[in-house]
Amino acid sequence: MDRLLLDSNVVVYLDQDPGRVTQHARDQIDGASEVYVSAVTGWELSIKQATGALKMKTTVSSLVESLGFLELPITMRHGEAVKMLPMIHRDPFDRLLVAQSIIEGLTLVTSDSRLVRYGTPILQV
């Protein structure tokens, strides 16, 4: 688990309640050579902030920068890979994160146990 991609829920936990991330997951995040946060996470969390469903202490981009994480842009390849995924999960944000993790060879860090069914490497928090 050298290169990681954080699910949106993990980014929220790190902002609001770091204790929800297990010690094992924190150790893996701290020891990873690269930790990415997708642009889709910025989009998803911004929508939730705009609708009042989520309050964050800072912007997603500021949080990512302050934690020393890398931004993963959304590419056409990522978008096209979504069509190859089985309809296990209907959330378009999660489906794009799974596609990105597969295309980029990243371990997805998440609390969503349903994502394991896609076959991509998962680190549960």
What are these regions (language model features)?
Residues 1-37, 50-62, 104, 116-117:
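Short, well-structured N-terminal submotif of metal-dependent ribonuclease cores
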Residues 7-8, 45, 82, 101:
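Generic structural signal for small/hydrophobic residues in well-ordered secondary structure
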Residues 60-87:
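Acidic catalytic patch
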Residues 98-125:
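Acidic, PIN/NYN-like endoribonuclease modules and their adjacent C-terminal/linker elements
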Residues 11, 42, 79, 115-116:
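A generic structural signal for short hydrophobic patches within well-formed alpha-helices
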Residues 93:
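Acidic donor-binding loop at a coil-to-helix junction in glycosyltransferase catalytic cores
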